[in-house]
Amino acid sequence: MQLPLIISLYLCLFLTAPVCVSAQAAPSAPGNETTEQLSAYEHLDQFIDVLTLIQKNYVEQPAMDELMSGAIKGMLSELDPHSAYMPPKMFEEMQIETMGEFNGLGVEITIKDHLITVISPIADTPADRAGIRAGDIIIEIDGTLTKDMSIMDAINQMRGPRGSEITLGIMRHGETAPRTFTLTRETIRVDSIRQRLFEPAIGYVRVSQFQQRTAREFKDALKALHEEADTPLQGLLIDLRNNPGGLLDQAVQVCDLFLSSGKIVSTEGRRKTDNFTYNATAADTQPGYPIVVLINEGSASASEIVAGALQDHKRAVILGTGSFGKGSVQSIIPLTDHSGLRLTTAYYYTPNGTSIQARGIVPDVSVEQAVWKKTTPHELTKEKDLNNHLEPPSPQSPPKQDMAGEDKIESDFQLLRALDLLRGWQQMKHLQPCPVDGGHAAS
């Protein structure tokens, strides 16, 4: 490819990419360039000088398309961990991924201190089943060190044909030696919503990611829980643990199911078109049953929007550990060659005006995911174990049995605490206040 054509393409990309973000941004008339545009022209002169020197003097004939791709990647990598350039194939895969299907390992990553760091594994994927955790640092991918590797290059290396193997070197916090994980790539079909019912009429909805159909599937899950309970729900658990985020509009729609008015989230950027406030509507608002939202350090982005909105409106109790702290909004910008940019264009704020960027959502009830061992029956002594104990008088109502399968959650300490909180609330609201004798006072 000739150098003038390369320069022409670069100028087109460099000067028109911001227009792709919003059709409202019009180019300045000739002679009316802004200070920012004039500064860009000056830097382009330097870029063209370097590109010319490479083409004329490099020891081998340079691949100009690779140079251009590398230059664009370099620009984006200087911004923040979430801005990136996506070549055509990767851009196409990204669009498919929002539908909930792709070939890979099922792990959401970011860059922290120039290291590829796990935000969270997606439930029931190769990464999750292998035991990869939020906060793990991926130091090697198939023997290639990842230090200073771009996030998109790391994703590209971890993607691959279904059934192919990949080896990851993982450094875990608190450990001195790396771990090695060999995983087999799968077609990851992410079911963003799972639900179940606990006694007494307490619904549980797990949201693994916010995809294009998540809000609709969430609403369907609530309907299914109502039908299964055959009575109004007495409480709801929303599990956002290890949810790396996803689509902003889906998070807003999920919040709108539980809020009838007021602000859900606002975004603020450098341009007026990036400033927007999303408000709740009265349509289809769920009844006012109590809600507990579960979060942890793997809860990021869109999941933090949901937790923050319900917390600020005092519509839910947030339980677990502090969230990831990703409080920025990325715009997906398609380019003319079918590649694309993922560019950070705004910060988002919870209804109270709080930015959670690098801070995260602080839970109302802090509960670590402790390792909890169920006590076996022979380790406890109860009345029925005593010699000559009295039998209960007849007739006797059979004890309430929780739904089948609840024993599967016994190792999930945070979920158990959340259930206890909702069940306790149901019990406490039926208590009668103790009459107070106005003639006496405690001292």
Where in this protein do the model-derived segments appear?
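Sec/Tat signal peptide C-region and signal peptidase I cleavage site
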Residues: 19-23
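Acidic, polar loop-rich interaction surfaces within structured domains
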Residues: 297-300, 308, 312-318, 323-380, ...
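Conserved functional hotspot residues or short segments at active or partner-binding sites
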Residues: 347, 352-443
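Glycine-biased strand-turn-strand hairpin within the trypsin-fold
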Residues: 26-45, 49-57, 63, 78-106, ...
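Positively charged n-region of N-terminal signal peptides that target proteins for export
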Residues: 1-7, 443
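Extended, small/polar residue-biased N-terminal targeting/export presequences
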Residues: 55-119, 163-167, 171-193, 416-440
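Cleft-lining beta-strand/loop regions that shape enzyme active-site pockets
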Residues: 26, 31-43, 47-64, 96, ...
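Bacterial N-terminal signal peptides
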Residues: 6-18
